[in-house]
Amino acid sequence: MEGSSSYEVPSVAAADLEEGAGQTRSLPATPSKDVHKGVGGIIFSSSPILDLSESGLCRLEEVFRIPSLQQLHLQRNALCVIPQDFFQLLPNLTWLDLRYNRIKALPSGIGAHQHLKTLLLERNPIKMLPVELGSVTTLKALNLRHCPLEFPPQLVVQKGLVAIQRFLRMWAVEHSLPRNPTSQEAPPVREMTLRDLPSPGLELSGDHASNQGAVNAQDPEGAVMKEKASFLPPVEKPDLSELRKSADSSENWPSEEEIRRFWKLRQEIVEHVKADVLGDQLLTRELPPNLKAALNIEKELPKPRHVFRRKTASSRSILPDLLSPYQMAIRAKRLEESRAAALRELQEKQALMEQQRREKRALQEWRERAQRMRKRKEELSKLLPPRRSMVASKIPSATDLIDNRKVPLNPPGKMKPSKEKSPQASKEMSALQERNLEEKIKQHVLQMREQRRFHGQAPLEEMRKAAEDLEIATELQDEVLKLKLGLTLNKDRRRAALTGNLSLGLPAAQPQNTFFNTKYGESGNVRRYQ
């Protein structure tokens, strides 16, 4: 991790990888007084690690003069200021954890440190990084998570540790030169575009960097030009001989303990980031490919003649496609129409089922009424014929008791033709009415069957026609009842007429009193004496 530039960690990624360093080990929770009491023995101790996390420290005093100290854990305290000679008193420090404190600035003496590799500043109200931090060539990991940084700009911070140090070195070189009035009117460095930002590249070794520093000290203007040129994409193949030498040196390679510590810290920070993503729906640890391409667009080497014709990456290629309000309104309208159509179809099906149920119930009632009428008719037909036979057998003629002769009740010569023809006419009329009713009923049944076969009409129209059919059926039923009632009345009248004739003929057959019937006596005398 520490020996080559391939282990460089960007600030945002380092924040994710170094979240919970203080959570991996058992942290002492003793107050600051106890800490000050026990530090006296630590000063002369040869232990390279000192853990004072969550100790309630408010300031750092001379108790930290431990030259052999390599790892110092001060997270979750109340520190506000770091002494100016802090890094000079701890020359062998490689790991410094200052997370969750109240530090607003770092001392400028950090630039002279030669062994610092990891610096954790998460959750500190720090707004500006010291320019001297760019000269710490041994720094491999920098955690700036949740820090309200204003210098360097956020675009530079997002590029990573290499870009931050390069920006700070360039700033220091530019502001160390004497400026003319024209250079003072130049726009500030913070108004940089994406194309002007530094890109992470291969770092040179410490010897090469020292040689370059010596050259820059001799020629400041040339150093500025070289620092500016380092922002542009490389044109020539870099010389890797120095890089190979630095890679071969064993002292630059990370130790097994540091690798284990980095890995453990990374695992805990990844778990913490997963919890944050689930809670607040934050962005992923790695940027999308489109954003990476937009940030690293300066790596591409454009042709000189096509510099002004090249199109910048549009927002559509970086951001996801969003529906316009018009398209959203159209989609919502279509969804509403589909719901309305489904509801309308369901209502039509329900109305059709209800209509079929009503028609079935009406047909069942009509059949029951017809069956009752048929049974009544059969009962009447069973009762009437025996009476007719009895009347016909008993009323062919009347018996005269005087001369013991049968006298016809209605002599053929004396019967009126109208009385003989009236029963025949009534029978013909009743038969004609019955035929007409049968034809009407058949036509009505055929119409109902045709309507049932055709289902293309609206439910309301079908309900109206069903009501009309029901009214017609009730009218036909009333006519049938009237016709049957008329037939029964005619039969009763004929029966009453027959019984009346019998009552008129029976007294003539009985013995008559001749003393009270002078007319009969006179007629009898006439008959006798003639």
UniProtKB/Swiss-Prot annotation:
Region of interest (Disordered), ranges: 178-215, 402-432
Q: Does the keyword Coiled coil apply?
A: yes
Q: Which domain of life is it from?
A: Eukaryota
Gene3D superfamilies per record:
Ribonuclease Inhibitor
Q: What is this protein called?
A: Leucine-rich repeat-containing protein 27
LRR repeat ranges? 46-67, 68-89, 92-113, 115-136, 138-159
Tell me yes or no: is Repeat among this UniProt entry's keywords.
yes
Query: Which InterPro entries does the annotation name?
Result: Leu-rich_rpt, Leu-rich_rpt_typical-subtyp, LRR-SigEffector_domain, LRR_dom_sf
Keywords from the UniProt entry: Coiled coil, Leucine-rich repeat, Repeat
- Residue spans making up a coiled coil are 327-385
Which organism is the protein's source? Homo sapiens
